[in-house]
Amino acid sequence: MRPADNPFRTERIDRIQYRLTGGAALDDLAERFAGLGGRAAIIGHHGAGKSRLLATLADHLETRGRPSLRIRCGRDPLPSLEELAGRLLVADELDHLSRRRRRRLLARAGRAGGMLAAVHQIPRDLPLLHHCTVDISLVAGLVCDLTGAPPPPDLARLLGDHAGNVRALFRHLYDRAADRTP
């Protein structure tokens, strides 16, 4: 299969919107975020959708008049108070910062427009907004949407083999699709 035809190619995966479960909606999360004082964390294991939800919710908040500054901790420099003025700090991979740098960033965000962060474990310094979880029905739905076909019969085993990491599972399915000849 040509890479451009692979249903698991990056450009297709990047267009997937995070799917809230249990009847929740982005408006519900936005209201809860406001109720937490505009400071909260999204948690989940590797490949559970934290970064996707972080970006989706930040986009949603921007449409509601909440401008943001987005950083990937450990890669991007820490923003100054001037850069943060009136903006929500959206920090992906917050747990990549040392304790000292994290405290400094939280203090700046607290004096600016708040903070929305993605982390792997429940933080002591931010309230929990949402816990990203993965289950087979969610992943099966994503695979069906990407391929237009039923998921492979071994999907549950593959998800387990990848410890629930959907990103790693999609890389595996990309390789599997690439190995098929037309």
Q: Language-model features: where?
A:
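Walker A/P-loop nucleotide-binding motif
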Residues: 37-55
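P-loop NTPase Walker A phosphate-binding motif
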Residues: 51-66
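Short, hydrophobic beta-strand segments that form beta-sheet elements in well-ordered domains
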Residues: 68-72, 89-92, 113-120
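Sensor-1/coupling segment of RecA-like P-loop NTPase cores
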Residues: 96-134
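A short, basic N-terminal segment
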Residues: 1-36, 175-182
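Amphipathic alpha-helical "lid/sensor" segments that cap RecA-like P-loop NTPase cores
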Residues: 152-182
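Conserved small helical "lid"/interfacial subdomain of P-loop NTPases
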Residues: 131-154
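Conserved P-loop NTPase "ATPase switch" module shared by AAA+ and STAND
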Residues: 72-74, 79-102
